[in-house]
């Protein structure tokens, strides 16, 4: 906590206007980075950007409730929020893709973790959509990604396909 507090000055208005200055200050040469430390840093940065009212975007599996809380806070602070949600019809597709990534020297994720995150993320989808000004829902189960629907203000649904994937019906509509 103390170490992260030391990086608080990175987010002064002067520093935000100079991207190379920010990047230089975010180099942690003396720290062996692990996924937990990286997630704490990312959360700190997101909350700081909200605090100083700067626009930002981030990628997440959305498998923990803190992302819903972040959307709530952003909405309370007057941010316009957009969600680009991409899922597959089955967690085994994701498992297969991770195995392929490992073959290509990418990082591995245990199968049980992939499956658990898959269902937790889908479980948060409806609440996340309700908190957004606009949500774009995609299915990435096959080679071609399908744009399923666009949802405005958490209510108005504009379907982009004739056949709705089962996961969309089950977890969103």
Residue map of PLM features:
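A glycine- and Lys/Arg-enriched "phosphate-lid" helix/loop adjacent to the NTP-binding pocket
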Residues: 76-124
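Conserved nucleotide-binding/hydrolysis micro-motifs of P-loop NTPases
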Residues: 63-64, 87-92, 142-144
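Glycine-rich phosphate-binding loop used to anchor ATP phosphates in small-molecule kinases
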Residues: 11, 17-85, 121, 128, ...
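NTP-dependent small-molecule kinase module
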Residues: 127-173
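Secondary-structure transition/capping residues
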Residues: 57, 105, 109, 136-139
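Generic surface-pattern signal
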Residues: 9-12, 103, 130, 173
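N-terminal phosphate/diphosphate-binding loop that engages ATP/GTP or pyrophosphate donors
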Residues: 1-13
């Amino acid at each position: 906590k103390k170490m992260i507090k030391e990086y608080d000055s990175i987010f002064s208005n002067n520093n935000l206007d100079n991207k190379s200055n920010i990047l230089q200050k975010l180099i942690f040469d003396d720290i062996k980075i692990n996924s937990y430390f990286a997630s704490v840093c990312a959360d700190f940065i997101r909350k700081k950007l909200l605090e100083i009212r700067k626009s930002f975007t981030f990628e997440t599996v959305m498998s923990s409730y803190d992302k819903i809380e972040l959307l709530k806070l952003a909405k309370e602070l007057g941010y316009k929020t957009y969600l680009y949600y991409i899922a597959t019809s089955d967690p085994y597709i994701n498992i297969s893709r991770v195995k392929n990534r490992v073959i290509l020297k990418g990082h591995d994720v245990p199968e049980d973790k992939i499956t658990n995150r898959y269902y937790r993320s889908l479980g948060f989808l409806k609440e996340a959509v309700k908190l957004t000004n606009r949500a774009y829902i995609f299915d990435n189960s096959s080679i071609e990604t399908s744009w399923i629907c666009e949802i405005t203000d958490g209510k108005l649904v504009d379907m982009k396909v004739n056949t709705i994937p089962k996961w969309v019906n089950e977890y969103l509509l």
